[in-house]
């Protein structure tokens, strides 16, 4: 694809976002890219950040190829659409949500919870950062149908990620991964995302879940006596 063709494409995508219902900070960032930073504009809009078998992962910023509340929103809306189909007839569908300490992780987790509840899906949201294994435990403990953790694992600090888990506490596998990917791809516009959440459908998770998780971890210890014996081991 020639540079002029690429530029035309990314400008069209950027203007499509500007004509959508986006926040003022994102709008200003896009306008700056259009006027002052052609290279970053191309990087931000030349493609759509791909939702793969593990979810999303990318650099944070404005644009279709960046991690932001709108790409997170499209992923969550697609997930919700699939959950409503997969568990049609279930009285209550619920999702557990956790996050790490990266920039914007709390914002992305709260955005995920809002969109879930806007779709009539209950959200269990940890009150602050938690390890991914505790998210998997919470899914099973609360009988959730799915879970999301906001993390980019080992990637540099400018990255963030969005990983989806199923009702067994494990990451999504076939056929659910393919079906969710297809639902996410079907979201063509920011305006299709339901952001208007219901606070009454968001339940905070805290110390009580921590205690249950730690008790279960202790139960799985292969040799508790040895652990107690060497509890003063320095690392």
Residues covered by each model-derived region:
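Phosphate/oxyanion-binding active-site loops and adjacent basic polyanion-contact surfaces
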Residues: 67-77, 104-105, 127, 131, ...
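Gly/Ser/Thr-enriched, mixed-charge loops and adjacent short helices
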Residues: 17, 40-45, 49, 160-235
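N-terminal cofactor/phosphate-binding cores enriched in small/glycine residues
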Residues: 49, 53, 68-69, 76, ...
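Cofactor-/ligand-binding subdomain signature composed of acidic, glycine-rich
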Residues: 2-74, 183-191, 223
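Ferredoxin-reductase
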Residues: 6, 17-18, 90-167
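Generic structural signal for well-ordered alpha-helical scaffold segments
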Residues: 77-85, 136, 214, 218-225
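Gly-rich Lys/Arg/Thr-decorated short loops/hinges at beta-loop-alpha junctions or inter-strand turns
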Residues: 50-66, 90-96, 114-118, 187-205, ...
């Amino acid at each position: 694809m020639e540079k002029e063709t690429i530029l035309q494409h990314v400008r069209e995508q950027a203007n499509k976002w500007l004509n959508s219902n986006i926040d003022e900070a994102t709008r200003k960032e896009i306008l700056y890219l259009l006027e002052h930073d052609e290279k970053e504009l191309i990087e931000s809009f030349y493609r759509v950040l791909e939702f793969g078998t593990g979810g999303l992962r990318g650099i944070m910023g404005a644009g279709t190829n960046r991690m932001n509340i709108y790409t997170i929103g499209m992923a969550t809306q697609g997930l919700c659409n699939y959950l409503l189909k997969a568990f049609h007839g279930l009285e209550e569908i619920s999702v557990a949500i956790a996050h790490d300490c990266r920039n914007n992780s709390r914002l992305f987790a709260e955005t995920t919870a809002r969109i879930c509840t806007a779709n009539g899906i209950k959200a269990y949201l940890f009150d602050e950062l938690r390890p991914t294994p505790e998210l998997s435990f919470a899914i099973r403990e609360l009988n959730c149908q799915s879970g999301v953790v906001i993390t980019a694992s080992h990637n540099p600090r400018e990255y963030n990620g969005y990983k989806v888990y199923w009702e067994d506490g494990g990451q999504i596998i076939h056929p659910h991964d393919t079906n969710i990917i297809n639902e996410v791809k079907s979201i063509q516009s920011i305006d299709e995302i339901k952001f208007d959440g219901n606070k009454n459908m968001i339940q905070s998770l805290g110390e009580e879940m921590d205690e249950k998780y730690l008790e279960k971890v202790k139960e799985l210890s292969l040799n508790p006596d040895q652990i107690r014996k060497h509890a003063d081991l320095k690392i």
